[in-house]
Amino acid sequence: MALLQISEPGLSAAPHQRRLAAGIDLGTTNSLVATVRSGQAETLADHEGRHLLPSVVHYQQQGHSVGYDARTNAALDTANTISSVKRLMGRSLADIQQRYPHLPYQFQASENGLPMIETAAGLLNPVRVSADILKALAARATEALAGELDGVVITVPAYFDDAQRQGTKDAARLAGLHVLRLLNEPTAAAIAYGLDSGQEGVIAVYDLGGGTFDISILRLSRGVFEVLATGGDSALGGDDFDHLLADYIREQAGIPDRSDNRVQRELLDAAIAAKIALSDAVSVTVNVAGWQGEISREQFNELIAPLVKRTLLACRRALKDAGVEADEVLEVVMVGGSTRVPLVRERVGEFFGRPPLTSIDPDKVVAIGAAIQADILVGNKPDSEMLLLDVIPLSLGLETMGGLVEKVIPRNTTIPVARAQDFTTFKDGQMAMSIHVMQGERELVQDCRSLARFALRGIPALPAGGAHIRVTFQVDADGLLSVTAMEKSTGVEASIQVKPSYGLTDSEIASMIKDSMSYAEQDVKARMLAEQKVEAARVLESLHGALAADAALLSAAERQVIDNAAAHLSEVAQGDDVDAIEQAIKNVDKQTQDFAARRMDQSVRRALKGHSVDEV
């Protein structure tokens, strides 16, 4: 007789059976998959013992290949071999063509302006290409673990915006994977090192991969990982080192700038090989397109020094955001294959005043951290005391009257988080409100980034200031934002999930935080002026309504005094003198006090008409 299998609701029927989870580092140049086995996190290798999977896909009419096989076709079939697709994720076609004008692919724009790559397999978008890489990694994990994955944690750069994060999730779904969560790459590295060393204090995670740079300042204390600040550049990485060196080799060899794609690929391959060799050797011989020459490490360092300096400027900004000095940082974790470049390690060590940590393979550390987190989230370590707190990189807020930005969630707030603020109507009888969601650090709308707009309709027709609208911002663990606006008395609401069609540009990423510091004093003055102008408009709007309703309560002389005060306020409100506007508002208030008192008395008399004192 078979036994009846009983389990608690929501739990596995076999509660002690280990669930299969993996951490995936979906990188620009290379990707990895890792898992926890026998209590140890490890990356999984292919049949030839290779842990890295080149993030390259080669498409043909009858199928595609991923990884090393695809990379060998890069020089032979450039148009159908897609590499560094992570850089294209969440970007518009116009943005890609401006940012990467020399890509060997042919693009078409979809109806909404997103890029479609022409291949032998048809038109493909970056999400589909990323999904094919994820499928290859998942297949490696499934084979190694002898079972289907119950869930994965996928890492993304800390500076990925909502569109890029959503694109990563969409790619995972297309690959048939259940995403437990997205995890910032520097945070994943902190998990790996934090568990291994148990170090407490402030740690900097310097992550220089193939296509992105991230710097995170974290505090580790008693198993708690708190991200104090983040910074970086979503379009700076080792690929840029490669292209600079390739351009240098092309100039030395006298190869035309607009040579065919095959030669361009040969140049890039030669540059990559030279870069790797120069990590150990002081010079290297390069052979390309019939040219042979010598390149020294000193020449390479001179080429990349400006890019390394850019990363250190981002480090300085992140430290300032965190309120931490460089000498307070206990350890510096190096992440990403590009941190093997000697100049990078040297300059980072000089900046922080200590040698950086490289005890965990910088190519593998992110995947290892993701695997540890996946093992916890899938339920294999339910008693884990580790707490992970990510942050949002830029403030989120709303546009208010006068073109001002009201910050609802400040930057570097830990996520997930939900914050709400109450707003009200500006005009009498206002029945709708436009909600404009902003991102950035400046005080004025014109200096911040627009994320989304939506409207709340069905607001009760009440006097100005009578309706109360609560706007709630909610950022989930993956950094995706949803905004809800609700009118309190009726419960009517509207909401939106913010998924911009493409990401921040280089200049926006680099300058938004910097500008907020450079223009801080100017912005405060501009905000004060805008606030006074809004208050002046509100006072005049209210006064005009009152005069239209109860002008009979005033004598001709009294009306003239009020009209003169209002005209003066209207005139000075067109200027830029904050004090003059403030004094004019006070003057209108002073000249209308008796009028306001008479209106109040009249309202009371009307309310009491027909009622006895006892009834009241």
Swiss-Prot record:
Gene Ontology terms: biological process: iron-sulfur cluster assembly
Pfam families per record: HSP70 (PF00012)
PROSITE patterns according to UniProt: HSP70_1, HSP70_2, HSP70_3
Highest rank taxon of the organism: Bacteria
Keywords, sorted A to Z: ATP-binding, Chaperone, Nucleotide-binding
UniProt keyword annotation of Chaperone present: yes
Molecular function GO terms recorded: ATP binding; ATP hydrolysis activity; ATP-dependent protein folding chaperone; unfolded protein binding
Family: Belongs to the heat shock protein 70 family.
Physiological role: Chaperone involved in the maturation of iron-sulfur cluster-containing proteins. Has a low intrinsic ATPase activity which is markedly stimulated by HscB. Involved in the maturation of IscU.
HAMAP family the UniProt entry points to: HscA
Protein name: Chaperone protein HscA
Gene that encodes the chain: hscA
